[in-house]
Amino acid sequence: MKVSEKGQLVMFKTLLATALVASASFSAMALELKGHLTQGGLVTGKLENAKSVSLNDENLKLSAQGDFVFGFGRDTETTHTLKWVDNNGKSYSQPIAITKRDYKIDKITGVAKKYVSPPKEVSARISREAVAVRKAREVNSDLLYFLDPVLKPAEGRISGVYGSQRYFNGEPRRPHFGLDIANKTGSPVYAPISGTVVFAEPDLYYSGGTLILDHGHGITSTYIHLSKLDVKVGDKIEQGNKVAEIGATGRVTGPHLDWRFNWKGERLDPALLMQDTLANKK
């Protein structure tokens, strides 16, 4: 069965059954998926009695209860394959089609020159910091907080969206991978879901004050341009705990929170996760 969605919240359950020719017995496995089948989307799944599951031949962490999660990056292909093996060694395959998104063009002026074309003397620092951030996002713990509804981490105006192609002072740069929430410096930032602090640095070159939380199975969330960090690496954070304060550190033109969600190396759209929360309240 081919699954295709127009990017909206999708919830489906399919029963995959195989008649056993050698006997009159009958075995079946139910696959449940919830999330957004679109670029930038996060999808949670559940399979009972499965011993392994993979997406495009990449193994996914599987909880004792059969929970797993995966996501799609900004420019990922639109066709994917989910495979799994049950406890009896039977293999299954599920094609998945996702929608392609169009992204806005975001032209930003007034950015300090040192952040548009950094001087050579800071190149080693930038590379070192990028490696540290990537390492923090490689965490693949057994936590299951990614199953919980996601709350908005700060009050304020949405000033930037996921996926937009950015131009700084007229020069093209990498797309934006977060959701920007503008508010005054010192405004509180709260944990949108529970997790563990895996990265907390007050002064990175591009992102300024930077915080990363682990939510399990390769899902992390990132908070940047912070003026103050209230937590440290190793802290266990409950949903709604104050973790930081909005700032204007790093490459910015004004105070705001740049909030990001990640599945391993893929950047996901936080706005879609908040849509899920709103849908659950209806």
Predicted regions and their residues:
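Cationic-aromatic interfacial patches
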Residues: M29-D102
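Surface-exposed, glycine-biased beta-strand/turn segments
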Residues: P95-S207
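Short, well-structured beta-strand-loop connectors
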Residues: P188-F199, V231-I246
